[in-house]
């Protein structure tokens, strides 16, 4: 490792992580962004944007399995799914494993992201872009959810952190648009950062989402790349019962879907909705 340069993440002040860089595959630094993809011996291929790790080959499966199978199996009868972002294709890969889904729409603001990730992160999409149920829409996510005539059973917001371009996907305008195009009984989920370090983000999302949905909460997963504690995923629906389904129901749906996962299982599904007390306290604070 001493012979390899080190790449340091810059997400948090006074605290962080680094990766040794075995080989830089791509690096573009402009006035608008700093994008790098490199190989790391421990985590495989790593993609970082503006000094923040977005995904790695080693542990991406945890994030993407939890962002897809939790809402889809909780819903139980999703036919039309919307993915906001997700240009690396891994979210599409996991959604497409549910054969009962009829349409998968993905909204990505930059067409170049998709072609770029297909070239440099082919294992993420694993051929899912060729699924005949899939439609790619090049548009801003906020604009799409507020203008589309389509409706969806599950909406997955695969957003970056709420800084720079990703900030719009944490706004009331976005959440209102998602409610607008979500079918009755539908589920909205979104990544919401590591709550121990980014607690204000969770509190802000909870407050805004509560204006549009009757049941707003979070679920969690431990993802090594997103260090600092558990990662939280926002959950919003008008049907609170979907968050409290019995393990027997989830097990039956999991079996029917014929899924084989590396992180997700029905027990993880149920346990994921148990949140630490400090988050409960923050969400209930006046």
Swiss-Prot record:
GO biological process: one example? spermidine biosynthetic process
One GO MF term attached to the UniProt entry: spermidine synthase activity
State where S-methyl-5'-thioadenosine binds.
33, 108, 140-141, 165
User: Under which EC number(s) is this enzyme classified?
Assistant: 2.5.1.16
Residues of the PABS domain: 5-238
Alphabetically ordered keywords of this record: Cytoplasm, Polyamine biosynthesis, Spermidine biosynthesis, Transferase
Which PROSITE patterns does the record cross-reference, listed alphabetically? PABS_1, PABS_2
**A GO cellular-component term linked to this record:** cytosol
| Pathway(s) per entry | Amine and polyamine biosynthesis; spermidine biosynthesis; spermidine from putrescine: step 1/1
Q: How does it assemble?
A: Homodimer or homotetramer.
Function summary? Catalyzes the irreversible transfer of a propylamine group from the amino donor S-adenosylmethioninamine (decarboxy-AdoMet) to putrescine (1,4-diaminobutane) to yield spermidine.
Name of the molecule in the record: Polyamine aminopropyltransferase
Q: Which organism is it from?
A: Klebsiella pneumoniae (strain 342)
Question: What lineage does the source organism belong to?
Answer: Bacteria, Pseudomonadati, Pseudomonadota, Gammaproteobacteria, Enterobacterales
């Amino acid at each position: 490792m001493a012979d390899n340069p080190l790449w340091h993440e810059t997400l948090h002040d006074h605290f962080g992580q680094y990766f040794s860089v075995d080989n830089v595959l791509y690096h573009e630094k402009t006035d608008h962004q700093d994008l790098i993809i490199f190989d790391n011996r421990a985590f495989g291929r790593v993609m970082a944007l503006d000094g923040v790790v977005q995904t790695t080959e080693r542990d991406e499966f945890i994030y993407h399995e939890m962002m897809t199978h939790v809402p889809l199996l909780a819903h139980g009868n999703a036919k039309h799914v919307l993915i906001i972002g997700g240009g690396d294709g891994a979210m599409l890969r996991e959604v497409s494993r549910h054969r009962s889904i009829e349409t998968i729409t993905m909204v990505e603001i930059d067409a170049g992201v998709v072609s770029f990730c297909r070239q440099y992160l082919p294992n993420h999409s694993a051929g899912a872009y060729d699924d005949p149920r899939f439609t790619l829409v090049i548009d801003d996510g906020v604009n799409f959810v507020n203008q589309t005539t389509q409706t969806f059973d599950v909406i997955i917001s695969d957003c970056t952190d709420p800084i720079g371009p990703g900030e719009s996907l944490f706004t009331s305008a976005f959440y209102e648009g998602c409610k607008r195009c979500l079918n009755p009984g539908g589920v909205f989920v979104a990544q919401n950062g590591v709550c121990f370090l980014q607690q204000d983000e969770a509190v802000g999302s909870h407050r805004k989402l509560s204006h549009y949905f009757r049941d707003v909460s979070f679920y969690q997963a431990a993802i090594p790349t997103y260090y600092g504690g558990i990662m939280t995923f926002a959950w919003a629906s008008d049907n609170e019962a979907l968050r409290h389904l019995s393990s027997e129901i989830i097990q039956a749906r999991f079996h029917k879907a014929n899924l084989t996962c590396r992180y997700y299982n029905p027990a993880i599904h149920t346990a994921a909705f148990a949140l630490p007390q400090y988050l409960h306290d923050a969400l209930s604070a006046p």
